[in-house]
Amino acid sequence: MARKFFVGGNFKMNGTRKDLKAIVDNLNNAQLDPNAEVVIAPPALYLDFVKQNLQKPNVEVAAQNVFNKPNGAFTGEISATQLLDLGVKWVILGHSERRNELGESDEFIASKTKYALDNGISVIWCCGESKDTRQAGETIKFVENQLAALAKEINDWKNVVIAYEPIWAIGTGLVATKEQAQEVHAAIRSWLKQNVSDKVAEETRILYGGSVNAKNCKDLAKEQDIDGFLVGGASLKPEFVDIINANL
């Protein structure tokens, strides 16, 4: 089965209404690959604003976080019910910035992923290694441990998109070579085959993230197990359109 090309744009803590309107207008006016699925993740307080201004049927909106409880005394958190109330059906979970800056563990991320999926929200689940882990030759083992923590919590993977983002490449200008990225993507798919099922391994989309731009996206997209991208800084720029159209 051919896996549909997927591009996510993680705006992180960037943009005002004026900035985001310009980004959305650029997407609305662009000729986008009709065979690409696109999801953009603005800051939480602009989710509805972005959603109201989007006019492309194949572009959806994602949250950058969701909590693992339905409601209650959890200051600053967002529930799945609240996201669904806005019509938001995607969320990014496990990003290294939340793992490292906010101390989110593999287990906590897995519990949030399960909660989102159980409530009908699809998940872009992030994994990836540090520079030290890469240099120690332990990248694949590290990523497999992250996958194992997730697999303990979830059984149904059909609404999970995996994003491999080597931490040393996020926002640094460094980028994994297409061979480095393909090696890890293939290892992730192999792990899914061995530990989940052939069907999940074949159907799950695995994205690459980490300093993706208009110059390197086409070569990366040609690799067998790279099914798209999770884009950070470049998603705020006009070149995001070129990344979406990497297969054209």
Curated annotation (Swiss-Prot):
The catalytic site is made up of H95 (electrophile), E165 (proton acceptor)
Q: Which domain of life is it from?
A: Eukaryota
Q: In which pathway does it act?
A: Carbohydrate biosynthesis; gluconeogenesis; Carbohydrate degradation; glycolysis; D-glyceraldehyde 3-phosphate from glycerone phosphate: step 1/1
Ordered alphabetically, the record's keywords are:
Gluconeogenesis, Glycolysis, Isomerase
What does the record list as GO biological process? gluconeogenesis; glyceraldehyde-3-phosphate biosynthetic process; glycerol catabolic process; glycolytic process
Q: What is the top EC class of this enzyme, as a single word? A: isomerase
The record's GO CC annotations read: cytosol
Q: What PROSITE patterns does the annotation carry? A: TIM_1, TIM_2
EC numbers for this chain: 5.3.1.1
Family statement: Belongs to the triosephosphate isomerase family.
| Assembly and interaction partners | Homodimer.
What is the protein name given in its UniProt record? Triosephosphate isomerase
